[in-house]
Structure formats: structure tokens, C-alpha cells
Amino acid sequence: DLVLELPVPWSCARAQDFARAGVSLLHAMGCVELLSFGSECGSTALLCETAQALESPEMRDCLRGCLDEGMSLPAAREKAAAQCLGKEAAALLQGANDALAFEYLRALKSLHSPIRPLAVLRKGARHDETGCAEGFPSAAQIRSLILQDNPQGEKSLPSFSFEILRREITAGRAPVSYSAMETAILSHLRRLSPADLALLPDISEGLEYRLYEGIRSACSLGSLFSCVKTKRYTHARIRRLTLHAFLGVTQGDTALSPP
């Protein structure tokens, strides 16, 4: 077995860059035949068919119109898909795993990669769901249980995995959370200018100024995320921008492929 680690600029990037970087690593190896990924629908054929339709000129025009209405990209894609392709295609975009699957398929196509996609049906909790009592818990639910020191967190992991986590907790290196770094992050962000923020990946339309004002007034990361978020700029996007700013990741980093 071989485990490849996706470097930080791409591991905390938007779905498009995350998928492109991961697929490019596998493609560069020259020996990978199959790319499997979690999926809410579990149908490789349906995902491939819909992915091709999402790239149509009609869909692009419809998407542009939705974005011009001030919608976020995820919401705009879902609305455009419903208008151009029907409710079934729009429903696929509601699933976090299926939405990411489309980016994997797009990356495979752009690289002319011979790697074949394989969708694996996701069972149990949905992505980021924390209240699921049956089936496999989500990663978000497991993290929440561990942060609460809930014994159910240990039961949610294989014993060998939890032993590694227990060792890191004992050493003071885990669990990692925004709250543990909040003061350091806010302190660093307050030293940045709008020009610095303009260099961040996935920033546009003067968002750096809104982020800058939020940084100056917010007293916590939670309040920063809330005051910068709008209908167009999602909570997830603001969190990514904040993390990139703290780590010094710029557009120039994510525009490249992983080494």
C-alpha cells in the first residue's frame, strides 16, 4: 500500500483545485488504473453522464446568469442544473461527495487520463452530519465526539487508528481545531493589508476589502466568518480564505500542480 499526502495549498483548497491536485498526482504516477471515491448516488454512469452535461454551452450560460444574480457558486450550479438538465441533475449537486465527484471527472478529462472512475455508495451519515445515530458516522461527527472527550469517539474508529490518535493527544499534538489556534490566527490576520489578502486563492470581486474589515472588527473566528459571509460568499469559502491567509498560501501556489 502507498499513501500519498496532498500538500497544504491543495488539501485545504476549493473542490476544483483539491480534485485537480489529487488526480494530477495519481495521473503522474503512470500506474494507477482506477480512481474510487465516495458518492451519495453510487452510480458511476450517472455521474459521468451528468458531468458531461454540466460542461455544455447552455449550462455555462445559465450558470453565468445565476452568478450574475449574486448567488454563490454551489447555489448557482444547482439552480442552473435544475433549469437546464432537470431536477435529478440538480439533486446530484446537493450531495457533497457527488459534487466533488464531478470535479474528479473534470480533472480526469482535462488531463486526458486513462484512469477509470468508480463511484462507491456512501452509507451512514451525510458529509458533515453530526447527529446520525445509525451506520457509519461522518468525519465531522467523529471529530466532534473526540473534542468533547466522548467515549463514543473511540468506538467510531478502528482500534489501531485510535491508538495513533491517543498517542498524539497524550503528546499534546491533537486534537487540532480552530479554537486552539484562534488567537494566533486573528493576530496574524490583523497584520495583513487588503493587498496581502488580494493574493489569496479564490478571492475576487473586492472580497479582500470585506474580509479586511471583518478582521478589524471581529473578536473571534466565529464572528469573523459570520460577518464576512453573504449569500454569494459561503461560510466554507471564508474559512478557506482565513486558513490560507494564516498559512501564507497564495494564488500562485494553488495554480500549480503538486510537486
Q: Positions of the model-derived regions?
A:
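Active-site cores that bind ATP or allylic diphosphates and position pyrophosphate for catalysis
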Residues: E5-P259
